[in-house]
């Protein structure tokens, strides 16, 4: 009977740990998405100002 209790406690701990890991992973995903959105907003702003300079700079950097 004591083995059943230990096993049940380990399962509960494992489930709690998994939930914490998933929560942490989800927060990292939200952070990554936010960073990507910021980068895309910056690119949109540059393209709105002067698309030709942006493309020229991008092509030169990519070609080196």
UniProtKB/Swiss-Prot annotation:
Alphabetical UniProt keywords: Isopeptide bond, Ubl conjugation pathway
Region feature (ARC ATPase binding): 20-58
The keyword Membrane belongs to this UniProt entry's keyword annotation: no
Pathway(s) the chain acts in: Protein degradation; proteasomal Pup-dependent pathway
Lineage: superkingdom: Bacteria
Transmembrane residue ranges: none
Cross-link (Isoglutamyl lysine isopeptide (Glu-Lys) (interchain with K-? in acceptor proteins)): 64
MF terms (GO), sorted A to Z: proteasome binding; protein tag activity
Biological processes per GO annotation: modification-dependent protein catabolic process; proteasomal protein catabolic process; protein pupylation
InterPro entries: Ubiquitin-like_Pup
Entry domain remark: The N-terminal unstructured half of Pup provides a signal required to initiate unfolding and degradation by the proteasome but is not needed for pupylation, while the C-terminal helical half of Pup interacts with ARC to target proteins to the proteasome.
Assembly information from the UniProt record: Strongly interacts with the proteasome-associated ATPase ARC through a hydrophobic interface; the interacting region of Pup lies in its C-terminal half. There is one Pup binding site per ARC hexamer ring.
Entry function: Protein modifier that is covalently attached to lysine residues of substrate proteins, thereby targeting them for proteasomal degradation. The tagging system is termed pupylation.
Family membership noted in the UniProt record: Belongs to the prokaryotic ubiquitin-like protein family.
Protein name according to UniProt: Prokaryotic ubiquitin-like protein Pup
């Amino acid at each position: 009977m004591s083995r059943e209790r230990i096993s049940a406690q380990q399962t509960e701990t494992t489930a709690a740990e998994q939930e914490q890991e998933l929560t942490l992973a989800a927060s990292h995903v939200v952070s990554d998405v936010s960073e990507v959105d910021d980068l895309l907003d910056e690119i949109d702003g540059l393209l709105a100002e002067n698309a030709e300079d942006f493309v020229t700079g991008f092509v030169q950097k990519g070609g080196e």
